[in-house]
Amino acid sequence: MLLLRAIRSMMPKEERIIEQFVEQARHIVTASEALEAVMVAEPDERGERTAALKRIEKDADRVAKEAGRGLHRTFITPFDRSEIQALINALDDCIDLMDEVPRHAALYGIDSFDTPMRRMAGIIRRQAALLTEVMPLLTSITANAD
C-alpha cells in the first residue's frame, strides 16, 4: 500500500486536457462570432473586426500549445494519446481557418460578403455552439459512448 502511494506520487498528474478542449470550443464560438462580425462590417470597420478575430486566434493558439505540452507531460491520458493530439490540431485548425477568411477576401479583392457567405458564417457559429455542448462530455467518455 505504501509502495503504491509512493509510485503514484512520482507519476505525472493528469493535465487539464479536457478543460482545455472546452476552452478551445469557447474560443471557436468567439471566433465564429467575430467572423460573422467581419462579414457584416462596413469596409472601414473590417480592419478592427479582423484584428479582434486575430486576437482570438492568438489566444486559442496559446491554449492549443498548452494542451500539446500537457499531453507530452501526462503519463495516463483520458483516451488515446494520438486521438487527443488529433483533436488539439483539429480545434486549432477551425480557428486558424476562420482567421484566414478576411486575409483571403482582401487578397482576392472581395469587398463585401454576400448572403450565402453570411449564412455559412451563421452555420459555422451554430456548429461551434454545439462543440461547447459536447466537449464537457469527454470527462466521462465511457458513460457517453452510447
Question: What positions do the PLM features span?
Answer:
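Cytosolic, long alpha-helical scaffolding segments
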Residues: 1-146
